[in-house]
């Protein structure tokens, strides 16, 4: 019954997913919300929830426009379900904000296949990834995805390869200016850069282990179908699928680090 209900794409499906995401968002944050019921706190939680919904909407748009899945609403359904089994993904504001900017960056990279406004898209993608790293440092690893995209879409002009670094320099200037105006000091790289740590003690929680195990099992299972589908696609469509696959590998690397 659920399968037949979500096998098409309708606005009502997004409404249902929005309501369900609101429920699990409030459920996992109930202790924080009840601890401080001031207007400022409630507005902050609601603003972060809007960030979550905006991320889901962009992801749905990205998948639909590039035909990354069949015409159905299962992509957003599974996204919210996976968020629901990893509580920390909904509790940490920085992770939600970083995720939004990474999704925006991936959207710009996938759109490179049109070969229109290439320089602007490369700049935007690098800039969004840089902003994401301000909230969660290891999001900077997605910067590598830009060069994967340039190779996939055969973007070979030397100037284009400089643009992503230019975007980071612009972001650094903006961050430094903000620090000087607000904190009366230069941008603190020591507090920004995190060291590599393979300490997995944070994953010792039983519920977290179960959630991650479910996601990994599902990912491995779906990869067989995904890779098979890539081989059957024409080149122009195949590149988008391969790019998403690279993004998946980078995401797993971030989880380990």
Predicted feature residues:
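Aromatic- and kink-enriched transmembrane "portal" helix at the membrane-lumen/periplasm boundary
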Residues: 41, 78-95
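Transmembrane-helix signature of polytopic, membrane-embedded enzymes
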Residues: 64-82
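Membrane-interface transmembrane helices that cradle and orient dolichyl/undecaprenyl
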Residues: 105-120
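Transmembrane-helix motifs of polytopic, lipid-linked glycan transferases
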Residues: 50-66
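Membrane-interface alpha helices of multi-pass inner-membrane proteins
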Residues: 123-137
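Membrane-water interface signatures at transmembrane helix termini and the short loops
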Residues: 223-257
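Perimembrane helix-loop-helix junctions
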Residues: 142-166
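Juxtamembrane membrane-water interface segments that cap and precede transmembrane helices
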Residues: 29-39, 188-209
